[in-house]
Amino acid sequence: FRRVLFRSRIQNGRCTGVETSRGFIAARKVGCAVAGSSSRVMQAAGMRLPIESHVLQAFVSEGLKPIIPGVITYGGGHFYISQSDKGGLVFGGDIDMYNSYAQRGNLPVVEDVCEGGMTLMPMIGRARMVRMWGGIMDMSMDGSPIIDRTHIDGLYFNGGWCYGGFKATPASGWGFAHLLATDTPHETATAYRMDRFERGYMIDEKGSGAQPNQH
């Protein structure tokens, strides 16, 4: 049942469905929630988002005995770590600091992340890495998400979750479903409007400024 999305079909200022590799799918409402590909997908609808795509690397170690019961985050080093059911340590840190759609990273970030981990837990320096990869993050300008209608009737957008997309999925989906069903934002998502950047109402919780790689 896999389909490759080509573009949204816009007629007279309204989205009437999507063009896919298996033909056209008509819809009264179309929701876009594609994380790191947000800017490219919405560009096909003629929109330019206040979002940049950046690479975030993740790492997995060899299997070890249970040592981490949950998830540990280290704000001082921007590091997080958990342990999988197979015993591998799953960890990561900061983005690679340049725009990219490539799902691979660079070595300076590998060194930085591993040093951050050993600062928190020196003993993991002896663990051997077995896998690493890069995922594409949809980094908004203020570090906060967007859940809103677009200027195109029938087209809705949910993105800009930065690092927190996977962890925020339940709440994100609940708020987005409410918007799609009622055409009004959920009470917990009223501030996540698309036009907040134009109006000067950014949600910069960290106080880092309007620069994606600082969030």
Functional labels for PLM-detected ranges:
Residues 1-5:
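Short, small-residue-biased leader/transition segments that mark boundaries at the very start
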Residues 6-7, 20-22:
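Glycine-rich, Trp-frequent "lid" loop and neighboring beta-strands that shape
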Residues 9, 14, 24-153, 213-215:
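Active-site substrate-recognition segment that forms the wall
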Residues 76, 118-215:
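C-terminal catalytic lobe of FAD-dependent flavoproteins
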